[in-house]
Design a protein with these regions (language model features):
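N-terminal pre-catalytic "stem/leader" segment of glycosyltransferase-like enzymes
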Residues: 1-54, 69
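Catalytic core of nucleotide-activated saccharide and alditol-phosphate transferases
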Residues: 38-124
Length: 124
């Protein structure tokens, strides 16, 4: 039996489908997902401030070049190369849109660490 979690999405772009998106699809593999006005976890983005009305774990996502404000969110997924321990995951928008098979690594709790194996130089 899967653990039940209550979630909601606010402040995303116009047309965002909160019941059918990559986040929910990943979560449904491990959890029984329930949408609630009183969620345990709120996912929010850069298109509003409604997330401030919630008293729960706040998870920020943006595909824009905006650094997450960890004074406002508990966890974040964004574009920038920053190190904030287990509270931050770099997820560029192109990964979300075009490389969905890589989600298996998120579901498996493992994210491959890329190693520098070659050198590339560009001369003009």
């Amino acid at each position: 039996m899967k653990k039940k979690i209550k979630i909601n999405f606010v402040d995303f772009f116009l047309g965002f489908d909160k019941e059918d998106n990559q986040f929910v699809n990943i979560l449904r593999k491990r959890y029984d997902v329930e949408f609630s006005d009183k969620p345990d976890y709120i996912f929010y983005s850069t298109f509003g401030k409604r997330f401030l009305d919630y008293d729960c774990v706040k998870i920020y996502f943006t595909g824009e070049c905006i650094v997450p404000d960890f004074n406002l969110c508990d966890y974040a997924m964004a574009y920038d190369y920053i190190n904030f321990g287990d509270r931050y995951l770099r997820v560029p928008l192109y990964e979300v849109l075009h490389y969905q098979p890589k989600y298996k690594t998120l579901v498996d709790d493992t994210i491959p660490k890329t190693e520098k194996t070659a050198f590339c130089s560009f001369v003009v």
